[in-house]
Regions:
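Structural marker of alpha-solenoid helical repeat scaffolds
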Residues: 29-30, 62-63
Length: 90
């Protein structure tokens, strides 16, 4: 699985968010994995799709309460609460 994680990270880092999301979605059809949802969230953030990213982080945090997605979700909730109160309802 680490090889897939690395590929998704590399695609996201070079700006190929469509490729990263396609690869993450392909693997998520095979198994529900917190790491994949976290990386999917990262790709969605880079693509500017923040609401979808928060949903991916939320799913990852439900699968694994120790996932880095927990911190990412808290960060985005804080940002949304501060800047976008009218666009986000907890």
């Amino acid at each position: 699985m680490q090889g897939v994680y690395g590929k998704i990270r590399a695609l996201t880092a070079r700006g190929d968010t469509a490729g990263a999301l396609a690869l993450a979605d392909e693997w998520l059809q095979k198994q529900d994995d917190a790491g994949l949802y976290y990386l999917r969230g990262n790709a969605l953030v880079k693509a500017g799709r923040r609401t979808e990213a928060m949903n991916a982080y939320l799913h990852a945090s439900r699968l694994d309460p120790d996932s880095p997605a927990v911190e990412a979700l808290a960060l985005w909730r804080g940002i949304m609460d501060f800047y976008c109160k009218d666009m986000y309802n907890p």
